[in-house]
A protein has these predicted regions:
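Short secondary-structure boundary/hinge segments and terminal tails
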Residues: 20, 54, 101-103
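Metal-associated gating/positioning segment near the N- to mid-region
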Residues: 30-87, 92-95
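Residue-level signal for pocket-adjacent positions within structured domains
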Residues: 20, 27, 59, 63, ...
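Glycine-rich loops and low-complexity Gly/Arg-rich segments
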Residues: 9-11, 29, 49-51, 60-64, ...
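Protease-associated
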Residues: 16, 22, 33, 43, ...
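Short, glycine-/Ser/Thr-/acidic-enriched flexible segments
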Residues: 9, 17, 31, 42-44, ...
Length: 190
């Protein structure tokens, strides 16, 4: 006997009376297993890989990277979700793909219920590609990728002291080819 209360297992054991008054399902000859977690997927952010309008896995035309949230492109009604659920997968860890940077963006964790609120942990991790394609985006070698990653961490550590100390908040640093905002101080000749 297995008793579920509010979506969680409350009792497992031989006492059938524990389920008295509850909806019962005869599991004779059936398997009962814990839900499977798919630890690296793109389920819900791509419907048809070759069709750009249904593919939110990467943003190759932007200089944003770590700020990108894969959850902003999540479709809980994607056709891949019920198929995945039928196979016993109850949770998916969804990672973005790298586009113009080895830092692809922020991934999330979702259940496979198909409900609008199925994202259980948004911004769960930052996906960084340190493999061959990430190395290519960072300058052509893994040492270049590691140097870029160390630089990104140094920028993140130094950001509060550099930009919050003056409490201005309107300077947007960019280590890309195209700065997103420039601010000139008082008395600037430009």
């Amino acid at each position: 006997t297995l008793v579920m209360l509010d979506g969680e297992i409350a009792y497992i054991g031989p006492d059938a009376a524990a389920a008295s008054g509850m909806e019962t399902i005869d599991g004779t000859g059936k398997w009962l297993t814990p839900g499977v977690i798919a630890p690296f997927t793109r389920i819900g952010i791509v419907e048809v890989g070759a069709e750009d309008s249904t593919n939110d896995t990467r943003a190759s035309g932007t200089s944003f990277s770590v700020a990108l949230r894969a959850s902003d492109g999540f479709n809980p009604a994607a056709t891949t979700i019920p198929v995945t659920r039928i196979e016993g997968v109850t949770r998916v860890v969804v990672a973005p793909a790298n586009g113009g940077s080895m830092i692809a963006g922020q991934g999330f964790i979702a259940d496979t219920s198909g409900a609008p609120d199925s994202i259980t942990t948004d911004r769960a991790f930052v996906y960084i590609d340190l493999g061959e394609s990430g190395a290519g985006l960072a300058g052509g070698s893994r040492p270049a990728a590691w140097a870029a990653l160390r630089g990104a961490f140094a920028d993140a550590r130094g950001y509060p002291s550099r930009f919050m100390a003056h409490n201005e908040g309107d300077t947007l640093p960019a280590r890309t080819r195209k700065p997103l905002a420039l601010r000139y101080g008082a008395g600037s000749s430009s």
